[in-house]
Protein backbone atom coordinates (compact mmCIF):
# COMPACT_ATOMS: atom_id res chain seq x y z
CA UNK A 1 0.00 0.00 0.00
CA UNK A 2 1.34 3.43 -0.88
CA UNK A 3 1.96 5.94 1.89
CA UNK A 4 1.33 9.23 0.07
CA UNK A 5 -2.23 10.26 -0.75
CA UNK A 6 -3.20 9.83 -4.40
CA UNK A 7 -4.61 12.96 -6.00
CA UNK A 8 -8.00 12.08 -7.46
CA UNK A 9 -10.33 13.98 -9.77
CA UNK A 10 -13.95 13.13 -10.55
CA UNK A 11 -16.31 14.66 -13.08
CA UNK A 12 -19.73 14.09 -14.63
CA UNK A 13 -20.00 14.85 -18.34
CA UNK A 14 -23.01 13.49 -20.27
CA UNK A 15 -24.20 11.23 -17.46
CA UNK A 16 -26.70 11.08 -14.63
CA UNK A 17 -24.36 11.04 -11.56
CA UNK A 18 -25.27 7.40 -10.90
CA UNK A 19 -21.60 6.40 -10.93
CA UNK A 20 -20.88 8.94 -8.19
CA UNK A 21 -23.78 7.54 -6.17
CA UNK A 22 -22.41 4.02 -6.61
CA UNK A 23 -19.11 5.23 -5.14
CA UNK A 24 -20.98 6.46 -2.07
CA UNK A 25 -22.67 3.07 -1.85
CA UNK A 26 -19.34 1.65 -0.74
CA UNK A 27 -20.39 2.86 2.73
CA UNK A 28 -17.81 1.71 5.32
CA UNK A 29 -15.54 0.33 2.59
CA UNK A 30 -15.08 3.90 1.37
CA UNK A 31 -13.63 4.85 4.75
CA UNK A 32 -10.88 2.27 4.25
CA UNK A 33 -9.54 3.94 1.09
CA UNK A 34 -10.30 7.62 1.79
CA UNK A 35 -7.17 8.18 3.92
CA UNK A 36 -5.12 7.31 0.82
CA UNK A 37 -7.06 9.65 -1.48
CA UNK A 38 -6.87 13.41 -1.84
CA UNK A 39 -9.91 14.50 -3.84
CA UNK A 40 -8.68 17.64 -5.60
CA UNK A 41 -11.46 18.07 -8.17
CA UNK A 42 -15.09 16.95 -7.91
CA UNK A 43 -17.74 19.46 -9.09
CA UNK A 44 -20.54 17.23 -7.81
CA UNK A 45 -19.46 17.81 -4.19
CA UNK A 46 -17.63 21.15 -4.41
CA UNK A 47 -17.32 24.20 -6.67
CA UNK A 48 -13.81 24.20 -8.10
CA UNK A 49 -13.05 26.88 -10.66
CA UNK A 50 -10.45 24.96 -12.65
CA UNK A 51 -8.88 21.52 -12.99
CA UNK A 52 -5.54 21.47 -11.14
CA UNK A 53 -2.31 20.08 -12.56
CA UNK A 54 -0.73 16.83 -11.44
CA UNK A 55 -3.79 14.64 -10.87
CA UNK A 56 -2.85 10.99 -10.36
CA UNK A 57 -6.19 9.35 -11.17
CA UNK A 58 -9.19 10.95 -12.86
CA UNK A 59 -12.57 9.19 -12.81
CA UNK A 60 -14.68 10.37 -15.75
CA UNK A 61 -18.42 9.69 -15.70
CA UNK A 62 -20.42 10.33 -18.85
CA UNK A 63 -19.73 10.48 -22.57
CA UNK A 64 -19.22 13.43 -24.89
CA UNK A 65 -22.42 15.21 -25.94
CA UNK A 66 -21.48 18.89 -26.32
CA UNK A 67 -18.44 21.04 -27.09
CA UNK A 68 -17.83 21.77 -23.41
CA UNK A 69 -17.56 18.02 -22.70
CA UNK A 70 -14.95 17.71 -25.44
CA UNK A 71 -12.94 20.65 -24.11
CA UNK A 72 -12.96 19.20 -20.59
CA UNK A 73 -11.92 15.70 -21.61
CA UNK A 74 -8.82 16.99 -23.41
CA UNK A 75 -7.90 19.14 -20.40
CA UNK A 76 -8.40 16.17 -18.08
CA UNK A 77 -6.08 14.02 -20.20
CA UNK A 78 -3.39 16.70 -20.22
CA UNK A 79 -3.46 17.12 -16.44
CA UNK A 80 -3.86 13.47 -15.35
CA UNK A 81 -1.53 10.49 -15.18
CA UNK A 82 -4.36 7.93 -15.30
CA UNK A 83 -7.81 8.45 -16.80
CA UNK A 84 -10.56 5.92 -16.06
CA UNK A 85 -13.76 5.62 -18.10
CA UNK A 86 -16.09 5.36 -15.13
CA UNK A 87 -19.35 3.69 -16.08
CA UNK A 88 -20.96 2.72 -19.34
CA UNK A 89 -21.68 6.26 -20.57
CA UNK A 90 -17.97 7.13 -20.48
CA UNK A 91 -16.92 3.74 -21.84
CA UNK A 92 -19.55 3.14 -24.54
CA UNK A 93 -21.85 6.18 -24.74
CA UNK A 94 -24.64 4.79 -22.56
CA UNK A 95 -28.34 5.59 -22.74
CA UNK A 96 -27.73 9.13 -24.13
CA UNK A 97 -26.11 7.40 -27.10
CA UNK A 98 -29.55 6.36 -28.37
CA UNK A 99 -29.77 9.97 -29.53
CA UNK A 100 -27.47 8.86 -32.36
CA UNK A 101 -30.55 7.34 -33.99
CA UNK A 102 -31.52 10.90 -34.90
CA UNK A 103 -29.80 13.92 -36.36
CA UNK A 104 -28.79 16.62 -33.90
CA UNK A 105 -31.25 19.03 -35.52
CA UNK A 106 -34.09 16.55 -35.12
CA UNK A 107 -33.42 16.22 -31.41
CA UNK A 108 -33.17 19.96 -30.80
CA UNK A 109 -36.28 20.75 -32.80
CA UNK A 110 -38.32 18.09 -31.04
CA UNK A 111 -37.22 19.12 -27.55
CA UNK A 112 -37.12 22.89 -27.88
CA UNK A 113 -39.13 23.95 -30.94
CA UNK A 114 -42.26 22.04 -30.00
CA UNK A 115 -44.31 24.40 -27.86
CA UNK A 116 -45.11 23.19 -24.36
CA UNK A 117 -45.62 24.58 -20.89
CA UNK A 118 -41.90 24.08 -20.24
CA UNK A 119 -40.26 25.95 -23.09
CA UNK A 120 -40.82 28.95 -25.32
CA UNK A 121 -40.56 27.10 -28.61
CA UNK A 122 -37.00 28.19 -29.36
CA UNK A 123 -33.61 26.51 -29.19
CA UNK A 124 -31.34 27.98 -26.48
CA UNK A 125 -28.05 29.33 -27.78
CA UNK A 126 -26.40 31.41 -25.07
CA UNK A 127 -27.33 29.26 -22.09
CA UNK A 128 -25.94 25.90 -23.20
CA UNK A 129 -22.84 24.78 -25.15
CA UNK A 130 -23.51 23.62 -28.74
CA UNK A 131 -24.14 19.90 -29.12
CA UNK A 132 -21.75 17.65 -30.98
CA UNK A 133 -23.25 15.90 -33.99
CA UNK A 134 -23.37 12.60 -32.10
CA UNK A 135 -22.72 11.15 -28.64
CA UNK A 136 -19.33 9.45 -28.38
CA UNK A 137 -17.43 7.56 -25.66
CA UNK A 138 -14.43 9.38 -24.23
CA UNK A 139 -12.00 6.94 -25.86
CA UNK A 140 -12.87 8.53 -29.21
CA UNK A 141 -11.13 11.70 -28.02
CA UNK A 142 -8.36 10.65 -25.62
CA UNK A 143 -6.34 7.67 -24.46
CA UNK A 144 -8.22 5.85 -21.70
CA UNK A 145 -6.08 3.86 -19.31
CA UNK A 146 -8.76 1.74 -17.62
CA UNK A 147 -12.48 1.12 -17.85
CA UNK A 148 -15.00 0.35 -15.11
CA UNK A 149 -18.23 -0.55 -16.97
CA UNK A 150 -21.77 -0.68 -15.64
CA UNK A 151 -24.85 1.50 -15.36
CA UNK A 152 -23.78 2.15 -12.75
CA UNK A 153 -20.68 0.10 -11.91
CA UNK A 154 -21.12 -1.94 -8.77
CA UNK A 155 -19.54 -0.50 -5.61
CA UNK A 156 -17.32 -3.60 -5.46
CA UNK A 157 -15.93 -3.00 -8.94
CA UNK A 158 -15.14 0.61 -8.06
CA UNK A 159 -13.47 -0.43 -4.80
CA UNK A 160 -11.47 -3.18 -6.49
CA UNK A 161 -10.19 -0.74 -9.12
CA UNK A 162 -9.21 1.90 -6.57
CA UNK A 163 -7.50 -0.61 -4.27
CA UNK A 164 -5.62 -2.14 -7.20
CA UNK A 165 -4.28 1.26 -8.22
CA UNK A 166 -3.32 2.09 -4.64
CA UNK A 167 -1.33 -1.14 -4.56
CA UNK A 168 0.38 -0.35 -7.84
CA UNK A 169 -1.58 -3.00 -9.73
CA UNK A 170 -3.73 -2.85 -12.86
CA UNK A 171 -7.51 -3.10 -12.37
CA UNK A 172 -8.86 -6.29 -13.94
CA UNK A 173 -12.28 -6.74 -15.53
CA UNK A 174 -14.26 -10.00 -15.54
CA UNK A 175 -13.78 -12.00 -18.72
CA UNK A 176 -16.95 -14.09 -18.39
CA UNK A 177 -20.54 -13.22 -19.37
CA UNK A 178 -23.57 -12.50 -17.22
CA UNK A 179 -24.97 -15.98 -17.93
CA UNK A 180 -21.96 -17.43 -16.10
CA UNK A 181 -23.02 -15.58 -12.95
CA UNK A 182 -26.74 -16.26 -13.31
CA UNK A 183 -28.26 -18.91 -11.00
CA UNK A 184 -31.16 -19.71 -13.33
CA UNK A 185 -31.34 -23.20 -14.84
CA UNK A 186 -30.48 -23.50 -18.54
CA UNK A 187 -31.47 -26.21 -21.01
CA UNK A 188 -29.66 -24.71 -24.04
CA UNK A 189 -32.79 -24.32 -26.15
CA UNK A 190 -34.03 -21.37 -28.19
CA UNK A 191 -37.50 -19.90 -27.59
CA UNK A 192 -40.23 -20.34 -30.17
CA UNK A 193 -41.53 -16.83 -29.57
CA UNK A 194 -40.37 -13.68 -27.78
CA UNK A 195 -42.17 -11.63 -25.11
CA UNK A 196 -41.95 -8.11 -23.80
CA UNK A 197 -40.67 -7.77 -20.23
CA UNK A 198 -44.15 -7.02 -18.87
CA UNK A 199 -45.82 -9.99 -20.56
CA UNK A 200 -46.58 -13.03 -18.47
CA UNK A 201 -44.98 -14.16 -15.25
CA UNK A 202 -41.61 -15.88 -15.75
CA UNK A 203 -40.67 -19.10 -14.02
CA UNK A 204 -38.41 -17.95 -11.14
CA UNK A 205 -35.92 -20.77 -11.71
CA UNK A 206 -35.63 -21.14 -15.49
CA UNK A 207 -33.44 -19.11 -17.86
CA UNK A 208 -35.31 -15.96 -18.91
CA UNK A 209 -34.02 -16.13 -22.48
CA UNK A 210 -35.23 -19.70 -22.90
CA UNK A 211 -38.64 -18.55 -21.66
CA UNK A 212 -38.81 -16.04 -24.51
CA UNK A 213 -37.60 -12.87 -22.79
CA UNK A 214 -34.88 -10.93 -24.60
CA UNK A 215 -32.23 -11.29 -21.92
CA UNK A 216 -28.79 -10.26 -23.20
CA UNK A 217 -26.76 -12.02 -20.55
CA UNK A 218 -25.21 -14.24 -23.22
CA UNK A 219 -23.50 -11.22 -24.84
CA UNK A 220 -22.78 -8.98 -21.85
CA UNK A 221 -19.67 -8.77 -19.69
CA UNK A 222 -20.02 -10.21 -16.20
CA UNK A 223 -19.36 -8.29 -13.01
CA UNK A 224 -22.83 -7.31 -11.86
CA UNK A 225 -23.56 -10.63 -10.19
CA UNK A 226 -26.51 -11.13 -12.57
CA UNK A 227 -28.63 -8.89 -10.35
CA UNK A 228 -31.32 -8.20 -12.94
CA UNK A 229 -31.95 -11.79 -14.12
CA UNK A 230 -31.84 -12.99 -10.52
CA UNK A 231 -34.67 -10.57 -9.76
CA UNK A 232 -36.71 -11.64 -12.80
CA UNK A 233 -35.66 -8.77 -15.08
CA UNK A 234 -33.90 -9.54 -18.39
CA UNK A 235 -30.33 -8.31 -18.77
CA UNK A 236 -30.17 -5.19 -20.96
CA UNK A 237 -26.42 -5.21 -21.56
CA UNK A 238 -25.34 -2.32 -19.35
CA UNK A 239 -21.88 -3.80 -18.67
CA UNK A 240 -21.09 -3.74 -22.37
CA UNK A 241 -19.30 -6.16 -24.62
CA UNK A 242 -16.76 -8.80 -23.64
CA UNK A 243 -13.11 -8.78 -24.67
CA UNK A 244 -13.92 -11.27 -27.45
CA UNK A 245 -16.65 -9.11 -29.02
CA UNK A 246 -16.36 -6.07 -31.29
CA UNK A 247 -20.01 -5.08 -30.98
CA UNK A 248 -22.46 -6.19 -28.27
CA UNK A 249 -25.52 -5.57 -30.44
CA UNK A 250 -24.14 -7.40 -33.47
CA UNK A 251 -23.08 -10.33 -31.30
CA UNK A 252 -26.53 -10.47 -29.69
CA UNK A 253 -28.27 -10.26 -33.08
CA UNK A 254 -26.16 -13.14 -34.35
CA UNK A 255 -27.29 -15.32 -31.44
CA UNK A 256 -30.93 -14.24 -31.73
CA UNK A 257 -30.91 -15.21 -35.41
CA UNK A 258 -30.71 -18.84 -34.28
CA UNK A 259 -34.29 -18.47 -33.08
CA UNK A 260 -35.39 -18.08 -36.71
CA UNK A 261 -38.52 -16.10 -37.55
CA UNK A 262 -39.32 -15.65 -33.87
CA UNK A 263 -36.55 -13.05 -33.70
CA UNK A 264 -38.40 -10.93 -36.25
CA UNK A 265 -41.10 -10.31 -33.62
CA UNK A 266 -38.71 -8.33 -31.39
CA UNK A 267 -39.60 -4.61 -31.59
CA UNK A 268 -37.08 -1.76 -31.77
CA UNK A 269 -34.12 -4.08 -32.17
CA UNK A 270 -31.44 -1.37 -32.38
CA UNK A 271 -32.48 0.29 -29.13
CA UNK A 272 -32.81 -3.09 -27.43
CA UNK A 273 -29.54 -4.67 -28.51
CA UNK A 274 -27.42 -1.51 -28.26
CA UNK A 275 -29.34 0.28 -25.53
CA UNK A 276 -26.17 1.17 -23.63
CA UNK A 277 -23.52 0.79 -26.32
CA UNK A 278 -24.74 2.31 -29.60
CA UNK A 279 -21.93 4.94 -29.89
CA UNK A 280 -19.41 2.09 -29.56
CA UNK A 281 -21.12 -0.10 -32.18
CA UNK A 282 -19.69 -0.76 -35.64
CA UNK A 283 -22.68 1.13 -37.08
CA UNK A 284 -23.19 3.77 -34.42
CA UNK A 285 -25.37 6.50 -35.86
CA UNK A 286 -28.19 7.33 -38.22
CA UNK A 287 -27.18 7.01 -41.85
CA UNK A 288 -27.21 10.18 -43.93
UniProtKB/Swiss-Prot annotation:
Q: What class of enzyme is it?
A: oxidoreductase
**Keyword entries, A-Z:** Oxidoreductase
Q: What is its EC number?
A: 1.12.99.-
Top-level taxon: Archaea
Q: Which InterPro entries match?
A: Hydrogenase_assoc-protein (IPR051349), NADH_UbQ_OxRdtase-like_20kDa (IPR006137), NiFe_Hase_small_N_sf (IPR037024)
Entry keyword Oxidoreductase: yes
| UniProt-listed Pfam families | Oxidored_q6
An example Gene Ontology molecular-function term: oxidoreductase activity
Q: Which SUPFAM superfamilies match?
A: HydA/Nqo6-like
Is this entry keyworded Oxidoreductase?
Answer: yes
Indicate the family of this protein: Belongs to the [NiFe]/[NiFeSe] hydrogenase small subunit family.
Q: How does it assemble?
A: The F420-non-reducing hydrogenase vhu is composed of four subunits; VhuA, VhuD, VhuG and VhuU.
The name under which this protein is listed is F420-non-reducing hydrogenase vhu subunit G
Species for this entry? Methanocaldococcus jannaschii (strain ATCC 43067 / DSM 2661 / JAL-1 / JCM 10045 / NBRC 100440)
